[in-house]
Curated annotation (Swiss-Prot):
GO function terms (MF aspect): ion channel inhibitor activity; potassium channel regulator activity; toxin activity
Organism: Anemonia viridis (Snakelocks anemone)
SS bonds (residue pairs): C37-C72, C39-C65, C55-C73
Leader peptide range in chain numbering: 1-19
Lineage, broadest ranks: Eukaryota, Metazoa, Cnidaria, Anthozoa, Hexacorallia
Classification via Pfam families: Defensin_4
Subcellular location: Secreted; Nematocyst
Gene Ontology terms describing biological process: regulation of blood pressure
The name this protein goes by in its record: Kappa-actitoxin-Avd4l
One Gene Ontology cellular component: extracellular region
Amino acid sequence: MNKALFLCLVVLCAAVVFAAEDLQKAKHAPFKRAARCFCPGKPDRGDLWILRGTCPGGYGYTSNCYKWPNICCYPH
């Protein structure tokens, strides 16, 4: 019984390590996970972030408009 419990613990720890490593790679992904959107009065297209209250940092967004419950963020 102890060997089976130890084996389950080892498998669980390995799964946590691999999941954490995968999340580190996802943080530095080269693409945005946003859809296209258009706001009234803006000539360009923006990035629609679904179920967010604010625009995420690090993408250079300077303006936005709300399309409840989503937000459309503009980089210009």
